[in-house]
Amino acid sequence: MTSRKQWTHDLTCQPGLIAIAATVLLAFSSAAHGAGEPRETAIRPFQVHVADAALADLRRRLAATQWPDKELVTDRSQGVQLATMKALVRYWQTEYDWRRAEARLNALPQFVTTIDGLDIHFIHVKSRQPNALPMILTHGWPGSIVELLAIIDPLANPTAHGGRAEDAFDVVIPSLPGYGFSGKPTIPGWNPDRVARAWDELMKRLGYSRYVAQGGDVGAAVTDAMARQAPAGLVGVHFNFLINFPPDVLAAAFGGGRVPAGLSEAERAALAAVTAAFRRGYLVEQGEHPQTIGYPLTDSPVGLAAWMLDHDADSYEKISHAFVDGQPAGDLTRERIVDNITLYWLTNSATSAARMYWESSRARADAVARPPVAVSIPVAFTVFPGEIYQAPRAWAEKVYPNLIYFHEADKGGHFAAWEQPELFASELRAAFRPLRGAQ
């Protein structure tokens, strides 16, 4: 008989203002741990319910928005356009219902467990198929667990989505430290390497002795770290974003080195795109001064939304079309976009999430000076056409010598799992198929 205790956990919405009353069901999970398991390693069921006062405060802030003048150009060269933001805020204030997001989350098996002194929130959906392959998927910024929700059923229940029963996965989706309902680090050091070790501990704690991992954006950095650490049980990884580069490319893009000789036209284009991407304003500011940008993002929901939208050109165009023209890209709908922004707002996680870039910038500087440990485990990679930069196969092969799968998809962008969940799931099935049954 599993012992249960229900209590209310307060997540601060705004410092000194309104607290979110998140109803959390705490219990020792009989599936993974016995009733006598210490609380430090216990897996506690979790559900969320935001206080009405927090939602009222959000609506009040939206209504009190002080708008800037319209941009002076007809494109997005000056940043997020006023028409896009006004359409988003109009929807957010008058049509959007956070309770629908809560219901969607609470319909899934959610849990919290303490790893390395920090509470880690995660979704864990087990397939009905007996030989399902366990997989841990890591989101990025400005995403969250919201960007991965639509791929859960195609992965866990492939036969309902045109797949085969033998392609099923047990799905584990944690919230990164400092994001969403996970705890916020109180000391420096929660870089991708540390998160990678925590993720392996999570999979072991769930009883998995053999599993795979997937990541894009910040999640790619974590998954890359897992691949380099190569813990016992991790048999392969998949990326949809190249986070590490051949040494000569790394030196040219980040260390001021010369452009490597002999690059193909595609590689030259990729190098230019990589160099430009890592000089974008959000990445530089969050990498250097996350605390500074945290003040306006914590005080203004509209400021937070604009900052999150100004991520990459392809995603911005799709989001703008969703609000201005009513033409969403796949599951990247108005509701899902605002679900994601509202999750950041209600959990007051803009600053703590941005600190991951501060941590990663130091790791990247180390990589320029000292090449990281090579990856020997099997690696799969999918390139999506709307991604910030197109990873050349030659680079992926140099960084990951044991590349077992490389495919260029015909649609999808930086948030590929969000935009094209069925396609993304089919890529993961194909990528990991060679590893099923291999002991």
Language-model features, listed with the residues they occupy:
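C-terminal subdomain of alpha/beta-hydrolase-fold enzymes, centered on the catalytic histidine
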Residues: 286-439
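Conserved hydrolase catalytic core segment
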Residues: 154, 158-160, 209-259
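Conserved alpha/beta-hydrolase
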Residues: 155-181
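Conserved acidic catalytic loop of the alpha/beta-hydrolase fold
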Residues: 193-211
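Non-catalytic accessory segments flanking enzyme active sites
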Residues: 55-126, 131, 336, 345-348, ...
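Glycine-rich "HGGG/HGxG" loop immediately N-terminal to the catalytic nucleophile
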Residues: 98-100, 146, 163, 176-190, ...
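Bacterial N-terminal signal peptides
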Residues: 16-28
